[in-house]
Amino acid sequence: MIIVFMKILRSIITYFNVLLFFLILIFFLFPFYLVCKIFLIERYVVRLSFIMMRACIKISLWLAGIKIIVTGSENIPKKSNVIIMGNHIAAMDPLIFIYTFACPFVILAKHSLLRIPFVNIVLIVMGVIFVNRRSIRSAAAAEVKAIKVMREGRSIGIFPEGTRNRGGDTRVFKKGSIKMALKTGTSILPVTLYNTNNFFIKNIIFNSGLSVYIHVHPLIDVLKLSEYEKENLTSIIRDQIVKKLETIKI
């Protein structure tokens, strides 16, 4: 009973911290973002938002008593931009990406998130690129935006499955992200996530004591790949991620 009470207490404190962050972002940074967008300098606000979000995530996870175990951090490049590509288990996955990678990057997310009040404002201020996969025009526009970001020297975070697998089998990776990497010559950083679907008890109470795992694989330089490797790169990356996932589960 005491353990349950402590988890509830931790959750309340954590939610208060998140609420404070939302208020700062919505009432201060969002208006500032709109002004900067007029002068085409919104990327500086996006960078600041990323830094604030990362700090909020780190503090919140500490308050909630959730441990993030990162392996392979030596594979994270210090300067060059990359496409961070991982398996998609749960809604918390993008937050774990932000927790792990200190250098600001742009996330590709599904268009339906724009319908969630307040969350949509946070995502907009963070420069998220929204994709409606049911619309060819929307997908093409998102690809153009992502390529522009990469050619500006910034990184992209993406989940090639396109939707959450909720801890089940890793879905087949879509080829769009691979095509963007090959088109721009941007290196790919594969990432394996595990246990992100167990963040909450009854969908609201933080699961204190939980350990979440993220493994960063060696960087893939697409410019050095053979034609065969380029043709099969989607399967190669998925197999690499799934293989690591199986060893973590043991």
From Swiss-Prot:
This is 1-acyl-sn-glycerol-3-phosphate acyltransferase. It comes from the Bacteria. Its EC number is 2.3.1.51. Pathway: Phospholipid metabolism; CDP-diacylglycerol biosynthesis; CDP-diacylglycerol from sn-glycerol 3-phosphate: step 2/3. Belongs to the 1-acyl-sn-glycerol-3-phosphate acyltransferase family. A motif (HXXXXD motif) lies at residues 88-93. Converts lysophosphatidic acid (LPA) into phosphatidic acid by incorporating acyl moiety at the 2 position. The HXXXXD motif is essential for acyltransferase activity and may constitute the binding site for the phosphate moiety of the glycerol-3-phosphate.
